[in-house]
A protein has these predicted regions:
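Hydrophobic anchor at the beta1->P-loop junction of P-loop NTPases
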Residues: 8
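Conserved substrate/cofactor phosphate-moiety recognition/catalytic segment
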Residues: 21-96, 112-116
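NTP-dependent small-molecule kinase module
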Residues: 164-223
Length: 223
């Protein structure tokens, strides 16, 4: 079976991580990958460590994850920028090109959240994140041409309702979130724009507003 390079993007509470776990289990069943088949209940196997404060890949890093994700917010914006850039660049390395590679948000989220919440990356500034995303995609197309980009989205009123009710299979994933309800439309529109402008040609959207997780998984598989 061909390798699968996959990036999910979208606002918080759109269902990226929930669907990501189901996709990983499905992929494991197709490839016989025991690491995916036997995922612990709290894990999704995607690299989901690119949005502050959740900057530690959960599998194999439990011993320092809590402290690291608490201390990361003590860094000044310049150091945060350096750290995030290291994470993005690391996952462009050749070591990830040969096997399945699953990511959530990757460098895309910084284009949305860094100017809004982190204190760096605004358009026209040093390390402007929107421009960085454009250049990063050029490298992805060169080194990982089979990458699939998926926008996971929901209507703003659905996002706000899930947020207010804390509706998530991964409540710990949303603890300490910097995402604000008042920013729902702005963030949703920004991810949509990133998706629409993306140079990645293998891309599609999944709207989870009215769909069950199983229905969203079926839609993913069908595409």
């Amino acid at each position: 079976m061909d390798k699968l390079h996959l990036t999910f993007i979208g606002t918080e509470y759109s269902g990226k991580r929930t669907l990501g776990r189901r996709v990983a289990l499905w992929r494991g069943s197709k490839t016989g990958n025991d690491d995916l088949i036997n995922l612990p209940p709290e894990a999704c196997a995607f690299h989901d460590h690119f949005v502050l404060p959740w900057v530690v890949h959960e599998l194999g890093h439990e011993y320092h994850r809590g402290l690291s994700e608490k201390k990361i917010l003590d860094l000044n914006p310049d150091l945060l920028e350096h750290f995030q850039r290291y994470q993005f660049e690391y996952h462009m390395g050749s070591g990830f090109a040969g096997d399945d590679h699953f990511l959530i948000d990757w460098f895309y989220a910084d284009a949305v959240y860094a100017p809004l919440y982190y204190g760096y990356g605004a358009p026209g500034s040093y390390a402007a994140r929107w421009e960085y995303a454009e250049h990063a995609e050029e490298r992805v197309l060169q080194d990982m041409p089979q990458m699939i980009l998926v926008l996971i989205k929901s209507r703003p009123e659905v996002i706000r309702d899930r947020l207010s009710r804390g509706e998530s299979e991964f409540p710990q994933r949303h603890a300490g979130s910097l995402f604000k309800e008042k920013d729902t439309e702005f963030v949703s529109d920004a991810f949509q724009k990133l998706f629409d402008q993306s140079k990645i040609t293998r891309k599609f959207e999944i709207d989870t507003s009215d769909a069950s997780v199983d229905e969203s998984l079926d839609e993913f598989i069908s595409k």
